[in-house]
Amino acid sequence: MKLHMLNMLNCLLLTVCDGHLHMHGNGATQVFKPRLVLKCPNAAQLIQPGKLQRQLLLP
């Protein structure tokens, strides 16, 4: 469940950064493509799994 939330948040974040990103059933594959991270350098630190997971685990 937490992993699903992590993937969803990353998909939404990258969709905002990259207007050409299309959401598919296997969105997780899209999320971790390096080119998408490079297109959105300001959000790169949010995309790091460790940081985002810590945010999800906080109340």
From Swiss-Prot:
<dbReference type="GO" id="GO:0005576">
    <property type="term" value="C:extracellular region"/>
</dbReference>
<feature type="signal peptide">
    <location>
        <begin position="1"/>
        <end position="19"/>
    </location>
</feature>
<protein>
    <recommendedName>
        <fullName>Anti-inflammatory peptide amregulin</fullName>
    </recommendedName>
</protein>
<keyword id="KW-0732">Signal</keyword>
<comment type="function">
    <text>Anti-inflammatory peptide that may facilitate successful blood feeding of ticks and may lead to immunotolerance in its host. Inhibits the secretion of inflammatory factors in rat splenocytes, such as tumor necrosis factor-alpha (TNF), interleukin-1, interleukin-8 (CXCL8) and interferon-gamma (IFNG). In addition, shows strong free radical scavenging and antioxidant activities in vitro. In vivo, inhibits adjuvant-induced paw inflammation in mouse models.</text>
</comment>
<keyword id="KW-0964">Secreted</keyword>
